[in-house]
Amino acid sequence: MKPSLTEQLCTRCGLCCDGSLFADVELAGSAEAAGLEVMGLEIEEDDTEGGVLEQPCGALRGKRCGIYAHRPECCRTFECRLLQDARRGTVSVEQAVEHIAETLKHVGRVRKLAEELGQREVNLPLKERYADALALADEAGVSRSRARKRAELETEMSAVERSITEKFLRDSE
């Protein structure tokens, strides 16, 4: 039996859960939030009824959801642009896998450079880690090496944002 597109793509990716695409996931209501809390996930209160599940998701295991059968409604219904394009046949599975690998390479590089610049808080969304790393680089003073890493970080983050916008986010997001 041929694996589904989600098995072929989503389980190689994880960008929608690891803080690269989104900073948080809005929950459908208090019952959904309570169910996730019972499973050990931390829910942040906000101005919505259910609150939000901050990213990176605490249920993410590698690139797979550790609570897949019980994941939030927002997660169950989300399909990135790349998955939609693969379903329509406008992108082959092989091309989609290449896009995922390329984006993950840039995300990994952003994380590594952020850490090298002093940002070691791994449980933050990627954009927050990036912003923190830039601030830390500026606070520490400008050495040639730091300036080079800062510029490289900006270039890599630019590549991530371009890829996310063009390949993963739908027009309405």
Can you annotate each of these PLM segments?
Residues M1-E173:
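Hydrophobic scaffolds flanking metal-cofactor catalytic centers in soluble metalloenzymes
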